[in-house]
Curated annotation (Swiss-Prot):
InterPro entries (alphabetical): KsgA/Erm, rRNA_Ade_diMease-like_C, rRNA_Ade_Mease_Trfase_CS, rRNA_Ade_methylase_Trfase_N, rRNA_adenine_dimethylase, SAM-dependent_MTases_sf
Protein name: Ribosomal RNA small subunit methyltransferase A
Molecular functions (GO terms): 16S rRNA (adenine(1518)-N(6)/adenine(1519)-N(6))-dimethyltransferase activity; RNA binding
Superkingdom to which the source organism belongs: Bacteria
Location relative to the cell: Cytoplasm
Source species of the chain: Rhodopseudomonas palustris (strain HaA2)
Gene3D superfamilies in the cross-refs: Ribosomal RNA adenine dimethylase-like, domain 2 (1.10.8.100), Vaccinia Virus protein VP39 (3.40.50.150)
């Protein structure tokens, strides 16, 4: 991409700005600009789109997003060492890159969007990837402030996001992700593409918010999933006792056989049980 955007190779940028990746920040820099371009294309078309990027580091994906045509990129970077490299990209793309030095776990980008929707595209720092995703999936109101997420995770986490019932990776994260979004695994990236090399393969995932998920109380859904998968090898009539209601009654009222295990219940089944949980609690609280 250096030949396309006229900016120096990423290895030179890292050396010049003393940007050795820090394990404490979950940093693994993706230096293959062909792969960053592939991620940007997977999030496209980006014309007239505002992209929110988390943890841009030396800016490989940032450059790809801008070169692919993103109207505006809001890059949220906690590591002050990376700001100089990002400012060079901003100078190359005047008015299109906004750099925010902040912790993505604490920063809310919505005030910068002026009421418009954005697209989240990021090689997420490994140590905060799952909490960030859960926060975005729990956004209120719904549909959320973003129209798509294209994100890189450790492959094991990516599998937990896109899993369906009867998959080994199916669990609480899959229930929440697939209740609110259409999810899909796009492609893998080998450890050799990163500096430093992680010990595991990474995967790029796309999540597109559903405009109208099945009606459900999110907190109740999370409670049911947590109870069921907290003892995933046990039958629902046992694992759901943690909810403080008759587990067999709860499952049966939702049309689910209480002898089933959590890993065999589809997302729609968890939604039904969450709705029944609300009804049972409301009935108990009615004088």
């Amino acid at each position: 991409m250096s030949a396309i955007d006229g900016l120096p190779p990423l290895r030179d940028v890292i050396k010049r700005h003393d940007l050795a990746a820090r394990k404490s920040l979950g940093q693994n820099f993706l230096l293959d600009l062909n792969l960053t371009a592939r991620i940007a294309r997977a999030a496209g078309p980006l014309d007239d789109v505002t992209v929110v990027e988390i943890g841009p580091g030396p800016g490989g994906l940032t450059r790809a997003l801008l070169a692919t045509g993103a109207r505006r990129v809001i890059a949220i970077e906690r590591d002050e060492r990376a700001l100089g490299a990002l400012e060079e990209i901003a100078a190359h793309y005047p008015g299109r890159l906004e750099i925010v030095c902040a912790d993505a776990m604490e920063f809310d980008p919505r005030p910068l969007l002026g009421g418009a929707r954005a697209r989240i595209v990021a090689n997420l720092p490994y140590n905060i990837a799952t909490p960030l995703l859960i926060g975005w999936l729990c956004a209120e109101p719904w549909p959320p402030w973003y129209d798509m997420m294209v994100l890189m995770f450790q492959r094991e986490v990516a599998q937990r996001i896109v899993a369906c019932e009867d998959d080994d990776a199916y669990g609480r994260l899959a229930v929440l992700s697939n209740w609110r979004c259409d999810t899909g695994m796009l492609f893998d990236i080998a450890p050799s593409a990163f500096v430093p090399q992680p010990k595991v393969t990474s995967s790029v995932v796309r999540l597109v918010p559903r405009s109208a998920p099945e009606p459900c109380n999110r907190a109740a859904l999370e409670q049911v999933a947590a109870a069921a998968f907290g003892q995933r090898r046990k039958m629902l009539r046992q694992s759901l006792k943690a909810l403080g209601v008759d587990p067999a009654r709860l499952a049966a009222a939702a049309g689910i056989d209480p002898t089933r295990r959590a890993e065999t219940v589809p997302v729609s089944g968890f939604v039904a049980m969450a709705n029944e949980l609300i009804d049972i609690r409301d009935t108990k609280n009615t004088p």
